[in-house]
């Protein structure tokens, strides 16, 4: 008598029962240990995070060179905080007494290296104090000093109708750090909550979503443990935005891989009573697409190592570590959990050979989609391509040339409010001068050229002998600064040019670009730095990165697809449709951001969106086309394409919704970069999994026919 389940009989002759129990037990215990060790590092990760722009610039950038020299001129690694006090009318004697008392209180705070005298404005309606803060320690220490400084300002007795705020580079740094505070709390809660709701709707089971979420969290714990260890050893540099992207990427990717494996496991349970054989079948069916898709994402991410910006360079390996742990968890922990729980995981409706947990393939939504693509393939791909192309036209509204530092934080920002007060009563660059290092012999020539330049309010030279730390130039013989001498370090002096415009404005950037020409003309060895120059160098490096890395990512992913699918035509088809999807997401995203009043974006936003959308978009196409290729080899091209679409439709769309939801969760962090990235990537993933993967790719594959697989032997098969 022949058994209806030969795999069950072969199981009895194969791996012994004790080993089938031991393997999942060891895997589960191993992951529990990794999660137990990695979990506590969540709270420690912020201690190795840096959000200082200058630390991410290439060493050859002028602003980086100047930043490295500043401690030698100023005596310490310091960052200025500017306390500005203003009123609608002239400050009275009582208010000025309060400002003097505030200056004395600030000078006594731990972490405050030095304070300037109170500097009243020309209109008499404002006063400012520059406090130099110790920036040699972790960023959290600096943030703590700013918080104490703000507490002193809040408690100061300045009188009625007087406004006060802490701004300047230290103020903006503290505001950005505060914006990132929720990154390991509310961000994870929102992302995991959204994923859990989606999984409950997909599986209609209370237990299976918990197993999938545990897999994702375990993968994240291991990734954080590895990244924290490398950052502690100064092998990696971590920023707040990289930390947020790591969290979201691991949760989304690990859940996606879990969805793919679970679909194969459920399908196998409908064909055999044996959980062990179902596990082996699911691993055979899911390992190749999961490893291939994850490997493609890793390859795309590692292209960021070619970036000039250290922040971009480090995102590549950090995110690649996250994808690697997601693959590992999806192919070890989840199979072990599902093997242990078996059909109970799918309760209340568990698949069995007598009652498979699947509908007939020609029924339901994906049966209808497959019939539409089958009957109207040409119309489907033409209409879909036109819709996507129309959306891509929104790219003309894209403004990816940089964002003022005052706009980095979405919502309330005391530093931004303080900068507005400062600009209303003082030159906009007060407290945040452009720093120019020149040979001592060129001091007078460069200082004169700077003073004559348009957009410069005044020029000073750094001096340890001066009570204010600098000497205004040219020196007035009758002034108290006349006896002070400039600080000379290795034959160089530090000039400080105060700009008329706010240091993060477009006007200031234009002035500093012109000042660099002025300085280089007056001194061959002169270099220009400071906050505005740092922003210029960062934006310029980001634009160079975009022009270099995008083509390289396309070439790398093309080669991977050709090797995986053994087809040049299929690889180019998938890549072209994914790039079209990216263009649509970028265009529609630009229109949405313009409507929201935040059209300007950092140049790295389109680059990051490209890497994620192209790599992840190809990810979903790999899920589809590996199954299609498998089916084409068995039942021919046309039937294989349609069956691949039907059987993968639900799982891939669910995976896309999960990833879109996790990236959308980045929007809860009030940082403009992350909000814009969240909108564009979430849009792109939804577009890719609903329109591109479900309609455009299958319809084009039917239109092209077996030539889709050229030059492999599948290209010579029947239609």
State what each model feature region is.
Residues 1-49, 112, 137-400, 523, ...:
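Membrane-embedded transmembrane helical bundles of large multi-pass transporters/channels
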Residues 50, 57-81, 88-173, 399-600, ...:
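Structured non-transmembrane domains adjacent to transmembrane bundles in polytopic membrane proteins
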């Amino acid at each position: 008598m022949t058994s209806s389940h030969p795999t069950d009989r072969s199981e009895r002759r194969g791996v012994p029962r004790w080993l089938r129990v031991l393997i999942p037990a060891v895997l589960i215990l191993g992951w529990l240990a990794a999660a137990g060790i990695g979990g506590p590092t969540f709270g420690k990760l912020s201690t190795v995070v840096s959000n200082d722009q200058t630390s991410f610039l290439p060493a050859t950038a002028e602003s980086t060179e100047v930043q490295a020299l500043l401690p030698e001129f100023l005596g310490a690694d310091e960052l200025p905080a500017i306390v500005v006090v203003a009123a609608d009318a002239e400050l009275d004697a009582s208010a000025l007494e309060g400002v003097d008392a505030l200056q004395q209180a600030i000078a006594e705070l731990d972490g405050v290296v030095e304070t300037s005298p109170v500097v009243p404005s020309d209109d008499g309606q404002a006063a400012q104090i520059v406090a130099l803060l110790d920036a040699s320690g972790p960023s959290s220490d600096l943030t703590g000093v700013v918080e104490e400084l703000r507490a002193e300002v809040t408690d100061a007795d300045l009188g009625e109708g007087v406004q006060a705020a802490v701004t300047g580079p230290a103020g903006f740094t503290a505001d950005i750090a505060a914006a990132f505070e929720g990154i390991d709390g509310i961000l994870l809660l929102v992302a995991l909550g959204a994923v859990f709701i989606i999984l409950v709707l997909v599986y209609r089971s209370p237990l299976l979503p918990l197993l999938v979420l545990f897999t994702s969290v375990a993968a994240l714990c291991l990734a954080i443990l590895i990244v924290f260890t490398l950052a502690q050893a100064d092998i990696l540099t971590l920023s707040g935005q990289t930390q947020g992207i790591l969290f979201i990427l691991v949760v989304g990717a690990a859940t996606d891989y879990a969805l793919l494996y679970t679909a194969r496991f459920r399908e196998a349970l409908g064909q055999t009573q044996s959980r062990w054989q179902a596990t082996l079948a699911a691993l055979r069916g899911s390992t190749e697409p999961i490893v291939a898709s994850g490997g493609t994402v890793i390859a795309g991410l590692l292209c960021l190592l070619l970036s000039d910006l250290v922040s971009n360079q480090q995102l590549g390996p950090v995110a690649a570590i996250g994808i690697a742990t997601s693959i590992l968890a999806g192919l070890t922990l989840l199979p072990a959990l599902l093997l242990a729980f078996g059909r109970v995981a799918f309760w209340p409706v568990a698949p069995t050979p007598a009652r498979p947990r699947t509908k007939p393939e020609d029924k339901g939504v994906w049966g209808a989609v497959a019939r539409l693509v089958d009957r109207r393939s040409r119309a489907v791909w033409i209409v879909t391509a036109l819709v996507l192309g129309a959306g891509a036209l929104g790219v003309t509204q894209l403004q990816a040339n940089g964002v003022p530092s005052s706009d980095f934080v979405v919502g309330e920002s005391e530093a931004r409010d303080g900068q507005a007060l400062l600009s209303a009563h003082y030159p906009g660059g007060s407290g945040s001068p452009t720093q120019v290092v020149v040979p001592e012999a060129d001091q007078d020539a460069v200082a004169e050229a700077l003073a004559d330049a348009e957009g410069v309010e005044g020029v000073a030279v750094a001096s340890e002998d001066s009570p204010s730390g600098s000497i205004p130039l040219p020196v007035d013989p009758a002034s108290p600064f006349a006896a002070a001498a400039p600080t000379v370090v290795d034959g160089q002096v530090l000039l400080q040019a105060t700009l008329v415009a706010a240091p993060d404005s477009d006007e200031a950037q234009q002035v500093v670009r012109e000042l660099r020409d002025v300085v280089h003309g007056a001194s061959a060895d002169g270099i220009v730095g400071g906050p505005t120059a740092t922003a210029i160098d960062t934006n310029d490096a980001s634009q160079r990165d975009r022009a270099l890395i995008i083509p390289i990512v396309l070439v790398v992913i093309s080669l991977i697809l050709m090797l995986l699918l053994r087809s040049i035509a299929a690889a180019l088809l998938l890549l072209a449709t994914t790039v079209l999807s990216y263009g649509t997401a970028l265009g529609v995203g630009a229109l949405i951001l313009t409507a929201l009043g935040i059209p300007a974006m950092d140049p790295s936003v389109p680059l990051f969106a490209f890497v994620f959308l192209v790599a992840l978009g190809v990810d979903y196409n790999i899920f589809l086309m590996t199954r299609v290729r498998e089916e084409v080899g068995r039942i021919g091209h046309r039937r294989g394409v349609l069956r691949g679409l039907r059987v993968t439709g639900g799982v891939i769309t669910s995976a896309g919704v999960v990833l879109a939801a996790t990236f959308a969760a980045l929007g809860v962090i009030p940082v403009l970069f992350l909000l814009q990235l969240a909108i564009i990537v979430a849009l792109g993933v939804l577009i890719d999994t609903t329109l591109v993967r479900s309609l455009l790719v299958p319809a084009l594959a039917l239109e092209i026919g077996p030539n889709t697989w050229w030059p492999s032997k599948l290209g010579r098969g029947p239609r």
